[in-house]
């Protein structure tokens, strides 16, 4: 199957990522473009697992509203499809926090948890940390994070959730 023939396929279980040529140029059209990057992520994960001699793990944490919980499920599904195994944040190779800006308590918890992740990343420098959600759409928040929390690898808002596979591939 060629990637161009799969672009209408919405059931990820029916897509054979191993048949996608990740050495070709990524398709311009969505969702074929994201399938390409899911395949690329899977190959990256497999290679990293061979190097480490163990499975790569991930942790998804949601702060805030029910909409975030739904988005986090989608993100966790993409991580699983790429080959990550769910784990606690202490053991995770990739941690993603889905943030909320509406609930101030959630905002404060994110900043507190970032200090905790910073300590974990000192012990595991290969750990990747991502922040997403509506809090990441506020320019002043993003600037603060980029300046004061430079250990964070990926920051993206809700308008880029559909590009998560592409953004994830860029982290490695």
What are these regions (language model features)?
Residues 1-167:
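Cofactor-cradling patches in redox/metallo enzymes
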């Amino acid at each position: 199957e060629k990637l161009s023939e799969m672009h209408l396929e919405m059931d990820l279980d029916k897509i054979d990522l191993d048949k996608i040529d990740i050495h070709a140029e990524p398709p311009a059209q969505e969702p074929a473009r994201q399938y390409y990057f899911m395949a690329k992520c899977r190959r990256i994960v497999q290679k990293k697992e061979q190097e480490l001699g163990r499975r790569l793990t991930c942790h998804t944490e949601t702060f805030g509203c029910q909409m975030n919980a739904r988005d986090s499920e989608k993100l966790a599904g993409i991580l699983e499809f790429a080959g990550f195994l769910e784990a606690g944040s202490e053991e995770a190779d990739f941690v993603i926090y889905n943030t909320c800006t509406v609930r101030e308590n959630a905002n404060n918890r994110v900043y507190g948890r970032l200090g905790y992740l910073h300590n974990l990343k000192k012990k595991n420098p290969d750990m990747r940390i991502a922040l997403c959600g509506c809090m990441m759409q506020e320019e002043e928040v993003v600037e603060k994070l980029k300046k004061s929390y430079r250990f964070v690898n990926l920051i993206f808002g809700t308008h880029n959730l559909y590009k998560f596979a592409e953004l994830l591939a860029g982290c490695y």
